[in-house]
Each structure stands twice: as C-alpha cells, then as structure tokens.
C-alpha cells in the first residue's frame, strides 16, 4: 500500500509544472522512489519497473539537481557516481571493535569448537553462511541515512571510505521503512563478483595494464581508491553479515542472528541467500560440504563458511576473547593458492591444434589436491606474467578449474632462471607451428595430418552435419584410431567390413551396415564436404557461402585472401583461416586422397535471382519447430538467399516463431518485425 501511495504521489508531482516551490518535494519523491527501486532490484531480486523507466526517473532527478543544487539530498542516488578525489584517507575509530574469527580447518577442529560452546551454554544451533573473500566494512546509518563507512583496519581503527562505499549500488543510501534504530551500524563484506572481476581484467588486458591476481585484491584496491569515480567503475557488491552498534539500546531487535539478518534485509540491505540455520552437528558438516561442492559455481569468491551461534542471548553469555568472539568460527576450505617452484615447461597439442604451454611444478598441496602441473595458456600470458623456468610462482586452483599460475615472486628468482621459448615445430607431428596476426593461440599447421587432432577431426568429418556417416559414432572413431585402422579421413573409405569386425561389439551384420553407410557417404555436397574438413571458423553457413561463391573446390583451393573477403559474411579473419588451411601440403594431400577414394558431389550451378527470393533479407528462428528441425529450416532459408541470424535486431526482416518462443518473439514484436509461424514457413519453402 505504501508503494502504491509513493508511486501515486510521484506521478502527481511529475504531472505539475516545476517551480522553486515544488522542486524540493518532487526531488525528494524521486530520491525515495529510485532508492526503493534500487532495493527491489539488488536486495529483493524483484524489480517492479524496467531499466528504461528507472533511467528516465534518474535522468529527471539529475536535471532537477542541476537546476536546484540547493535541494540535492545526501541520500540521492546520483551521489553514487563519485566525488572529488581525496588527498588521503582519514582514520576512524570504530565505536565497537571489529574482531577477527578463529579458524577451523577440519571436522575435528569444528567438533572441538562445538564442544567448547555447548559445554558453556548447552544445546546450540548455528547460523551458517559463506565466508566471502572480500573486505570487511562498517557502515553507520543515522536516522536511516548513510553517514559514514570504514574499513576494518586493525579492528580498532579503520579508514574512512564513505564516498567509495556510496558508489556500491547494492548498499542503500537511505534505509527502507521507518522501524530502524536512530543509529545503527551494519557490518558486512564488500566484494567483487567473479563476472565483474573478469570484466575488469579484460579491460586492463586490452589497455596492456597490470591485471589483478584475484577478486579479493581487486575489491580491496577498488575500495581504497582516493578517487571514488574509479571505485564507481568497478562494479563492487556487498552482503551484510551482522549488526554492530545500535542506539538507543532499548530498540527492539530480533532474538536470533538469522532473524537479525532478515531484519537488515527488511531495511533494504543485501544479505546472502546461502545462509542457513543448522540444529545438528551433522547438518553443519553437510552445509560445509554442499557449499564446498558448489564453490566454483557461486557468483562470488569464498574461502570457507562461517558458523555463528544463532541465539543472541547465548552469544552474550559466551562473550569474547582478546581478538575474536567465542560464539563464531570460520571453517576454512583447503587453500586455493600456494607458492611452489616452476621446474620446466612442456608443450601439449589440443584437438584443435592449439599448442599450450604446461608448467611442470614442484608438487604442492592446494585446493584439496596435490598439484604438479599448471596451465600457462599462451605466449601472451607468459609475457604478461614475466615468468621464467626456475621462478617461485603462485598457483591457484578453484574447484574443477585447471590449476594456473597467477603471479611470480620476483625477489626469489635465481640467477640461472631460463626464458620460456615456444617450439617452432609441433611436438606431435613435426609440422610448423604458426600464430596468426591478432590471435593469442599458437597452432600446429598439421591439421588433418596431426595425430593429436586426428580423433576430433574424424569425428567431425563423419558427423551428421558433415558427411553424415550413419552409425559412425564417437566410440567407433576412437576404436578405429586406437587400433590403428584409420589415420586420416580418406582411410574410412578403404575399410572393408571384415576389418571392422575387429572393433568391440561389432558383428559382421553391423560391420556390413557401417560399410554401406560409408559407401553412401561418398556422394555428398560441396558445402558438406567443406564443412567436414574442419577449417577454423567455417561453419555450415560459411561453407555454403564459399561453395556458392566459388562453385568448385578447385577455384576455392587457389583463392587469395582478397578474393575470399568478397564472399558474403566472410571477413579478414575467416579469410585468413581458409587461405591458411589450403596452403598446408598435409591438408591438400588428405583432400586429394578423399577424392581418389571416390568422394564426390554434384556441380554447383550459380543460383538465379528467381531462385533466391530472400536474398538480402535477414531471418531469425526461435522456439520449437515440429515438422522441420532447426538446421534444415536454416539451410533451406539460406538456399533461398536469406541470412539466418541468431538474434533479433532492427535489421531483422522476419522472425519464424515456433512453440514456446521467448524473448526473441517479444523483442520482434517490440521492434515491429514481421513474425510468421511454422505453417507459413513451410508454405513459403514449398512455393519457392
């Protein structure tokens, strides 16, 4: 009801002509509305207006504040963008010390903590929450308005980071409602979500700037910027985890820690959705294992879970020791970062030909396992890290992610450290390795010839969208190669049925059927053949465009990059990949062997204008089609000259909407794009 009254009052004020007399109440109503919508978005996860509506209200407030600066409120959402840069941070003495937590590293440690607690206060339940890997922050609200914010510092004295904290969108500048204390201190963790961290490092990488090692360092560095505009650009977030000082002390608060967190949430403060109350020791251990299992999938970094006695009266009975509360403990996960020695580098060749440097490490226990290898990704990463053989390095292992080197320890570099040099030839097949301009990855040029790429190349060659060899599944391909019956795609067409009976669970009847399917696959189309070759960046549509444009394999084999760029939807990068593929003798040998084995296709006649009525049009498919599969529909539209895109835009000519069409249909309707159903599509294809 209050929300309806707020919206109604704002609508009334917005409908009036603005004068010096009504500007202030209008600005106050806009602030109140925008702050409420911020909380609905960041805390309740239930936005009630669109982003464009929010932006419109924000723009109106900015215009009014520019015209009437004397009425700018301290809790205005416009104040989040950051103000003047500071010369230094002022010191703040905490009203109540911000203590650290004792740690538990295994079940025995936590069981001992549980015994100490229950011996003092009897039966207990715990409020369990993820231990965020960020920066502890104290935020003070007076009469509901954010007054100041500080870092934890040494627990007694921290730094004033008020202006920086105001830029964090999930932190309300004014508390929601009116049932909060006159003065309330909120404690929580400021952190950088994983997605924001990746985006920050990507921007730094593009500018050739130093990268942050992990989200915790990024969050700490962002909060301690003297220029709050920099903090505002860093997409920090915040979760409240406790109440600090409350005045007057007579203000009624919830009786359990969990309920107090819900109280904070009702005031508009974000609280983790992963919090849970556990009544039994077994439930605590199950919670720990659950969060540990899901750790790598959470949107933020954590390094353990925090267990707090849930009952506030029991907390008060237990009290504190010098540096930590007796009623809480951090149950830490196995370390994800450790230091070790880089003893050497090996080079591996992946299924796509990527040559990847793999660091050989002095074995070290990290992330719950012993690690002796870590990826170095590519030459750019080696250069960025400045890493050499013999260096002491920091390695990181997060969940199921392959361990990686994230930094070196320069002061420990020995005098005989050696630079890491990429090989000039593929360590598997001996072909030249090459790195195309603009690419980070170095690749083997062996293509279809390279043993490291062989299995995946032949699986792709036989797949449904390529030569479509019925019955030639992945396991069959793997057996053929493991038993050395096949070394290149052309060898498939030389296999007699009798030889295929050597495969596991392959009788003569099955072998005969497979041999017949291989024989049938000899007759194909040029687009399918080109797609089957596995040229980088050449999918079905590109293969079709190449075949249509050049008309023959012979013409395509000798095409220059300049000629390739003339093909529809082919840019310089794809043109380089195609030209590079046909320049490799190994690949030409495989193609010649395939043709000698009898692989053939009909001659392509250049389509007339009448045969391509959709030329120049962009179509999009969405939803489930019942009578056509998506690939067939796409291929038939392309044959009629249409470009089939993956998303709807103002340039889309038509959307084909099947069953359960979602956001693409809504966007098409919003943009006024023509929409047809599957029946209309079938009629169009039948008449073309």
Curated annotation (Swiss-Prot):
EC number(s) given by UniProt: 6.5.1.2
Binding site for Zn(2+): 426, 429, 444, 450
Keyword terms, alphabetized: DNA damage, DNA repair, DNA replication, Ligase, Magnesium, Manganese, Metal-binding, NAD, Zinc
Top-tier EC class: ligase
Keyword DNA repair among UniProt keywords: yes
Biological processes annotated in GO: DNA repair; DNA replication
Every BRCT domain range: 609-688
Pfam families: BRCT, DNA_ligase_aden, DNA_ligase_OB, DNA_ligase_ZBD, HHH_2
Single annotated GO MF: metal ion binding
Catalytic site positions: 131 (n6-amp-lysine intermediate)
Binding site for NAD(+): 51-55, 100-101, 129, 152, 189, 308, 332
PROSITE patterns: BRCT (PS50172), DNA_LIGASE_N1 (PS01055), DNA_LIGASE_N2 (PS01056)
Family note: Belongs to the NAD-dependent DNA ligase family. LigA subfamily.
PANTHER family on file: CHROMOSOME TRANSMISSION FIDELITY FACTOR 18 (PTHR23389), DNA LIGASE (PTHR23389:SF9)
Official protein name in the record: DNA ligase
């Amino acid at each position: 009801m209050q929300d309806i009254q707020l919206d109604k009052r704002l609508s009334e004020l917005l409908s009036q002509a603005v004068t010096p007399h009504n500007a202030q109440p209008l600005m106050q109503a806009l602030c109140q509305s925008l702050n409420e919508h911020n909380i609905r978005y960041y805390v309740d996860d239930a936005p009630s207006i669109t982003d464009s509506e929010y932006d419109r209200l924000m723009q109106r407030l900015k215009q009014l504040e520019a015209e009437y600066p004397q009425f700018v409120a301290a809790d205005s959402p416009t104040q989040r963008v950051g103000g003047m840069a500071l010369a230094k941070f002022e010191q703040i003495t905490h009203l109540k010390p911000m203590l650290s937590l004792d740690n538990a590293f295994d079940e025995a440690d936590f069981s001992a903590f549980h015994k100490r607690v229950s011996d003092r206060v009897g039966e207990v339940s715990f409020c369990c929450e993820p231990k965020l890997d960020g920066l502890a922050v104290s935020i003070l609200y007076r009469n509901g308005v954010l007054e100041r914010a500080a870092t934890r510092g040494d627990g007694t004295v921290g730094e004033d980071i008020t202006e920086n904290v105001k830029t964090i969108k999930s932190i309300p500048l004014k508390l929601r409602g009116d049932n909060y204390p006159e003065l309330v201190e909120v404690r929580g963790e400021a952190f950088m979500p994983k997605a924001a961290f990746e985006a920050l490092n990507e921007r730094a990488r593009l500018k050739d700037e130093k990268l942050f090692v992990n989200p915790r360092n990024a969050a700490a560095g962002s909060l301690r910027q003297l220029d709050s505009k920099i903090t505002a650009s860093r997409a920090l977030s915040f979760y409240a985890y406790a109440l600090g000082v409350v005045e007057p002390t007579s203000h009624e608060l919830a009786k359990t820690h969990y309920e107090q967190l819900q109280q904070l949430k009702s005031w508009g403060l974000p609280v983790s959705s992963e919090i849970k109350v556990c009544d039994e020791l077994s439930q605590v251990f199950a919670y720990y294992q659950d969060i540990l299992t899901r750790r790598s999938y959470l949107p933020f970094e954590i390094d353990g879970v925090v267990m707090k006695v849930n009952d506030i009266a029991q907390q008060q009975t237990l009290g504190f020791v010098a540096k930590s509360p007796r009623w809480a403990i951090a149950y830490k996960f196995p370390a994800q970062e450790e230091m070790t020695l880089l003893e050497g580098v090996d080079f591996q060749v992946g299924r796509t030909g990527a040559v990847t440097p793999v660091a050989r490490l002095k074995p070290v226990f990290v992330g719950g396992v012993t690690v002796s290898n870590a990826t170095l990704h590519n030459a750019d990463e080696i250069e960025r890290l400045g890493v050499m053989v013999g260096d002491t390095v920091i390695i990181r292992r997060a969940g199921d992610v392959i361990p990686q080197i994230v930094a070196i320890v320069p002061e420990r570099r020995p005098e005989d450290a050696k630079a890491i040099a990429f090989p000039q030839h593929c360590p598997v097949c001996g072909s030249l390795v090459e790195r195309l301009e603009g690419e980070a990855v170095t690749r083997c040029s062996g293509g279809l010839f390279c043993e490291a790429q062989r299995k995946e190349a032949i699986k792709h060659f036989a797949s449904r969208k390529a030569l479509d060899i019925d019955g030639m599944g992945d396991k069959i391909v793997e057996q053929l190669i493991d038993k050395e019956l096949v070394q290149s795609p052309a060898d498939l067409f030389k296999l007699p049925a009798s030889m295929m009976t050597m495969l596991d669970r392959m009788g003569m009847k099955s072998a005969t059927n497979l041999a017949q399917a291989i024989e049938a696959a000899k007759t194909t189309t040029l687009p399918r053949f080109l797609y089957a070759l596995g040229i980088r960046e050449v999918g079905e549509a590109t293969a079709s465009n190449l075949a249509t444009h050049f008309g023959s394999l012979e013409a395509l084999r000798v095409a220059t990059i300049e000629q390739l760029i003339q093909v529809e939807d082919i840019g310089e990068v794809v043109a380089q990949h195609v030209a590079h593929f046909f320049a490799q003798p190994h690949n030409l040998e495989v193609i010649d062997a395939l043709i000698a084995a009898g692989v053939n296709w009909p001659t392509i006649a250049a389509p007339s204008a009448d045969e391509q009525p959709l030329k120049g049009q962009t179509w999009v498919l969405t939803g489930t089609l019942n009578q056509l599969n998506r690939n067939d529909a796409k291929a038939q539209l392309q044959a009629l000259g249409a470009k089939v895109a993956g998303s709807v835009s103002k340039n889309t000519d038509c959307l084909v909407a099947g069953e359960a069409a979602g956001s693409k249909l809504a966007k098409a309707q919003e943009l006024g794009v023509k929409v047809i159903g599957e029946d209309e599509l079938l009629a169009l294809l039948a008449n073309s």
